[in-house]
Amino acid sequence: MQGKYVIAYDLGTGGLKASLHDASGTTLAFLVCEYPTLYYKEVFHEQRPEDWWQAICRSTRLLLDKVKEQNICKEQICALAISGHSLVGIPMDREGRPLVGQVPIWSDGRAKEQARRFFETHDYNAW
């Protein structure tokens, strides 16, 4: 079992981009798993964390399937790199289960007025 590999995940507005890389940084496989963004009441923009998780699980299986002929297996994955579109908290219970089914994402407009007031006293470029 030679080689160590990294899987990178990028949680975006329209879906998850996932890629598998070797130690030199060469991309060996890439794919996108789409999930919905829920838009309602004009300013509400939300996603379901469960959709994110399912996309990560599905993309991992698909990536490993794509490189199966290169004899790359899950035991050779040494690291995960994860980035996302939002600085969002997901409230969890003591057992690690989400307390809400949907969370706001970066484009949600409900706090527009609060943001405006914040930047009246804080430099936007310094933020």
Locate predicted features:
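N-terminal glycine/serine-rich phosphate-binding loop of ATP-dependent small-molecule kinases
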Residues: M1-G101, E113, R117
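Glycine-rich phosphate-binding loop plus the immediately following alpha-helix
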Residues: W106-W127
